[in-house]
């Protein structure tokens, strides 16, 4: 993978579901903010040439880092939603990032993406006409619930995947799709959904389950365990 890409990391969320007064991306993990692990995981790939972190305006928790692993780290202010923050990050990218360049978008609270998975995403996504996302096939049995909370049926899982990040798309297509969705008042929960709404079909690239998102305190404990395994 020789083509350089920038990564946009939306980090303007407040982590309401986590139940902490501190946004989860800044929670200390082995003495370091969670987001540092995320940034280092992305910067470890030689094809990632810069990072744009989208923070809340006036974010006092942000430490003002300007580089990671010798690569430039820029910041901009985000919006009320994830989609608005991603759009802000894409528009704030430096001039060296052209309209048709591929850009990675990655969750700030997903600190454990493997270098090998990132490599396969970049290889497959940059060779695909639309782009690609990391994802994991659904392996559990899925039940559909009725309005009373009882089981209403069992859903076939053979073609279902859980969408992870990073997600890799061309900057111009993602910007255009996000702007149209915002104008239409449609909430976009991930970047692949933005592309799907334009009639495009991104590629699914399987990744490790260890690339999970920190959503609950149990997830944080799990990540600490993953860190201990690295030693």
Swiss-Prot record:
Cross-referenced PROSITE patterns: ISPD
Pfam family, one: IspD
Entry coiled-coil feature ranges: none
Gene3D superfamilies, A to Z: Spore Coat Polysaccharide Biosynthesis Protein SpsA, Chain A
Metabolic or biological pathway: Isoprenoid biosynthesis; isopentenyl diphosphate biosynthesis via DXP pathway; isopentenyl diphosphate from 1-deoxy-D-xylulose 5-phosphate: step 2/6
Keywords: Isoprene biosynthesis, Nucleotidyltransferase, Transferase
Entry EC number(s): 2.7.7.60
GO terms, molecular function: 2-C-methyl-D-erythritol 4-phosphate cytidylyltransferase activity
InterPro entries: IspD (IPR001228), IspD/TarI (IPR034683), IspD/TarI_cytidylyltransf_bact (IPR050088), ISPD_synthase_CS (IPR018294), Nucleotide-diphossugar_trans (IPR029044)
Site residues (Positions MEP for the nucleophilic attack), renumbered to this chain: 157, 213
Reactions catalysed according to its record: 2-C-methyl-D-erythritol 4-phosphate + CTP + H(+) = 4-CDP-2-C-methyl-D-erythritol + diphosphate
Site (Transition state stabilizer): 17, 24
GO annotation, biological process: isopentenyl diphosphate biosynthetic process, methylerythritol 4-phosphate pathway
Superkingdom as given in the UniProt entry: Bacteria
Role this protein plays: Catalyzes the formation of 4-diphosphocytidyl-2-C-methyl-D-erythritol from CTP and 2-C-methyl-D-erythritol 4-phosphate (MEP).
Family: Belongs to the IspD/TarI cytidylyltransferase family. IspD subfamily.
Protein name: 2-C-methyl-D-erythritol 4-phosphate cytidylyltransferase
């Amino acid at each position: 993978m020789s083509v350089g890409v920038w990564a946009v990391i939306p980090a303007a969320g407040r982590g309401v579901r986590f139940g902490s007064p501190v946004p989860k991306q800044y929670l200390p993990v082995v003495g370091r903010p969670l987001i540092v692990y995320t940034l280092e995981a992305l910067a470890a790939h030689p094809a990632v040439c810069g990072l744009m972190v989208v923070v809340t305006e006036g974010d006092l928790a942000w430490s003002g880092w300007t580089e990671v692993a010798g690569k430039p780290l820029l910041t901009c202010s985000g919006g009320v939603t994830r989609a608005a923050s991603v759009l802000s990050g894409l528009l704030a990218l430096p001039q060296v990032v052209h309209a048709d360049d591929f850009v990675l978008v990655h969750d700030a609270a997903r600190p454990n993406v493997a270098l090998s998975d990132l490599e396969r995403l970049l290889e497959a996504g940059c060779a695909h006409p639309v782009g690609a996302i990391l994802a994991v096939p659904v392996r559990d049995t899925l039940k559909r619930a009725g309005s009373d909370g009882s089981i209403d049926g069992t859903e076939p899982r053979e073609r279902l995947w859980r969408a992870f990040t990073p997600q890799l798309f061309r900057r111009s297509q993602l910007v255009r799709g996000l702007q149209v969705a915002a104008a239409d008042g449609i909430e976009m929960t991930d970047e692949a959904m933005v592309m799907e709404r334009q009639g495009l079909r991104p590629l699914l690239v399987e990744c490790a389950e260890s690339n999970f998102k920190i959503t609950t305190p149990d997830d944080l404990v799990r990540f600490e365990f993953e860190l201990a395994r690295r030693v």
